[in-house]
Amino acid sequence: MKKKGLNYLMQVAIDGPASAGKSTVAKIIAHNLGYIYIDTGAMYRACTLIAHDNNVDYGDEKAILNLIDHSTIDFKQEDGEQKVYVNGKDVSIDIRTPEITENVSQVSALRSIREKMVELQREMAGKHDVIMDGRDIGTTVLPDAEVKIFLIASVASRAKRRFLDFQEKGIHQDLKDIEHDIEVRDYKDSHREISPLKKADDAIELDTTNLTIDEVVAKITEIIQKKQKN
């Protein structure tokens, strides 16, 4: 564990492909254990939204970095939910639209953008007990995390989860299109040059295809609590 003053900080890394359930279970566990939850995917989505709203090409690394350097990305807890703010505006729904979802992989693959976000993520993890989820937390962002989890699930089950999540948010997209988008996203995330989606050698793999959220939460919580006792 990392030491902060007289106390020790716990770092939990949860990685996996799109819609494997990372954010959902991470939020619940963080709430139950009193940890800070850091949604790294939301940070890259916010960067993508910033580019979109300023009519900047998603591959224009220099322009996007300049925009980010002059923007603020914040997380706030409101009514029991984590909200994402960009320059003081709540963009929690805006960053989940199909447009942003389809292009976040391109933005997150840009070296300087990734370096900037990783720097911010490590800074956050050095101040609190954290649960951080993403694609490269256990391999790149927090390689020394005490607990590393790698969640997987079938494309069909992940597409259904995203479809239902979109419905709740009032976003309409065909299920087959979502399945295709997930397959494309998986390929991009796994084959990008910088910090590709990859299971850390010391990560524990959990297949969530046939597990309920409560079951996944229970399994990961047990792993964390065992580590705390050591």
From Swiss-Prot:
Instruction: Please name the PANTHER family in this protein's record.
Output: CYTIDYLATE KINASE (PTHR21299:SF2), CYTIDYLATE KINASE/PANTOATE-BETA-ALANINE LIGASE (PTHR21299)
| HAMAP family the UniProt entry points to | Cytidyl_kinase_type1
Q: Which InterPro entries match?
A: Cytidylate_kin, Cytidylate_kinase_dom, P-loop_NTPase
Domain of life per record = Bacteria
Q: Where does the sequence pass through the membrane? A: none
Q: What class of enzyme is it?
A: transferase
Report the GO terms under cellular component: cytosol
Its catalytic activity? CMP + ATP = CDP + ADP; dCMP + ATP = dCDP + ADP
Q: Its Enzyme Commission number?
A: 2.7.4.25
Output the GO biological process annotations, alphabetical, semicolon-separated.
nucleobase-containing small molecule interconversion; pyrimidine nucleotide metabolic process
Q: Where's it found, cell-wise?
A: Cytoplasm
The name of this protein is Cytidylate kinase
Which protein family is named in the record?
A: Belongs to the cytidylate kinase family. Type 1 subfamily.
Q: Where does ATP bind?
A: 16-24
What Pfam families does the record tag this protein with?
Cytidylate_kin (PF02224)
Instruction: Enumerate the UniProt keywords alphabetically.
Output: ATP-binding, Cytoplasm, Kinase, Nucleotide-binding, Transferase
Q: Name one GO molecular function term.
A: ATP binding
CDD domains (UniProt xref): CMPK
Q: Which Gene3D superfamilies match?
A: P-loop containing nucleotide triphosphate hydrolases
